[in-house]
Amino acid sequence: MLARRKPVLPALTINPAIAEGPSPTSEGASEANLVDLQKKLAELELDEQQKKRLEAFLTQKAKVGELKDDDFERISELGAGNGGVVTKVQHRPSGLIMARKLIHLEIKPAIRNQIIRELQVLHECNSPYIVGFYGAFYSDGEISICMEHMDGGSLDQVLKEAKRIPEEILGKVSIAVLRGLAYLREKHQIMHRDVKPSNILVNSRGEIKLCDFGVSGQLIDSMANSFVGTRSYMSPERLQGTHYSVQSDIWSMGLSLVELSIGRYPIPPPDAKELEAIFGRPMVDGIEGEPHSISPRPRPPGRPISGHGTDSRPAMAIFELLDYIVNEPPPKLPNGVFTQDFQEFVNKCLIKNPAERADLKMLMSHTFIKRSEVEEVDFAGWLCKTLRLNQPSTPTRTAV
């Protein structure tokens, strides 16, 4: 089970309301919570807009009360994965739109109660780079996890529309993912464990947030059999069953960045013909410093198990894929398409030995990140155009 200790600094949290009717001191308690919230906001390095948005979210959340199955009206399905279905719902008592993840588990009541208890840690995970949490409950054989609704969906969904995501956009994504991982590690001593495009959510305000991180060891254990797809983003050390740390999340981020850059899951690597089809021009062997001829063993016959590219080979079996991740050279970005800074950044994430792989601190000070932090990028505008969303009347140029 994932070990958790008390955060070094007080976690940013506001106590969820309990549906027992108003008490004489509820107004005073609410004001005390708000003062406490403002103090904790000051501890995080946020700009004014981020502070206002977090404060608004937590103030709304305090009015939600106890979550019950009968209080939700289903609007539409948002997606499925990790053993659950995510739907867009309206919480009738508050009028709030939420994303509700339903996970069906055949488990004993004691295990179920432990999962719900462990998920309560999410109430304390409040950051501009972490999807907001309203609460979790059990009903009719299913655990419900209610979260902030992100109208841009996940980056794997965005990729289907965009085909490829531009480097300057991925610069902003990289900043948000690194800051989200650093927040989870520094404030809560937890690692994500499941970084991949479908767990990076975006919205029309230009915000980029992580979801589905491993706060509940019992839930992870109970869902172990449904993690086959997720294993394709796991680091070599994790696939081999050895000790792993937040360095494993960095591998997963690097692999995700290559996928979002070329438009398909990058293992096995695309050959020159496929790269030419992807980028619309001839490529010389495609991958910098890693010609296919020096691969230690012949390239497996299968194509990626999923993706949006033009590879027509039969799908790669999962055991072939996992063997490839452990024993073959890591993926790289194609030469001549991306900046050297971005290529180096990804290469540092995808070093197979975790002791040599870059850590969060090194990556945050990398030239690619420093450049992306000062670059003016209209992330919200790009996303809204790509997904044909209505842009809010007061969008930000970047939310990171």
UniProtKB/Swiss-Prot annotation:
It catalyses: L-seryl-[protein] + ATP = O-phospho-L-seryl-[protein] + ADP + H(+); L-threonyl-[protein] + ATP = O-phospho-L-threonyl-[protein] + ADP + H(+); L-tyrosyl-[protein] + ATP = O-phospho-L-tyrosyl-[protein] + ADP + H(+). Keywords: Acetylation, ATP-binding, Cytoplasm, Kinase, Magnesium, Membrane, Metal-binding, Nucleotide-binding, Phosphoprotein, Serine/threonine-protein kinase, Transferase, Tyrosine-protein kinase. ATP binds at residues 78-86, 101. The modification Phosphothreonine is found at residues 394, 396. GO terms for molecular function: ATP binding; MAP kinase kinase activity; metal ion binding; protein serine kinase activity; protein serine/threonine kinase activity; protein tyrosine kinase activity. Residues 72-369 form the Protein kinase domain. Its main location: cytoplasm. MAPKK is itself dependent on Ser/Thr phosphorylation for activity catalyzed by MAP kinase kinase kinases (RAF or MEKK1). The active site is at 194 (proton acceptor). Residues 288-309 are annotated as: Disordered. GO terms for cellular component: early endosome; focal adhesion; late endosome; membrane; mitochondrion. The modification N-acetylmethionine is found at residue 1. The record marks 10-11 as: Cleavage. InterPro entries: Kinase-like_dom_sf (IPR011009), MAP_kinase_kinase (IPR050915), Prot_kinase_dom (IPR000719), Protein_kinase_ATP_BS (IPR017441), Ser/Thr_kinase_AS (IPR008271). Gene3D superfamilies: Phosphorylase Kinase, domain 1 (3.30.200.20), Transferase(Phosphotransferase) domain 1 (1.10.510.10). Its EC number is 2.7.12.2. PANTHER family: DUAL SPECIFICITY MITOGEN-ACTIVATED PROTEIN KINASE KINASE DSOR1-LIKE PROTEIN (PTHR47448), MITOGEN-ACTIVATED PROTEIN KINASE KINASE 2 (PTHR47448:SF3). This is Dual specificity mitogen-activated protein kinase kinase 2. It comes from Canis lupus familiaris. The lineage of its organism: Eukaryota, Metazoa, Chordata, Craniata, Vertebrata.
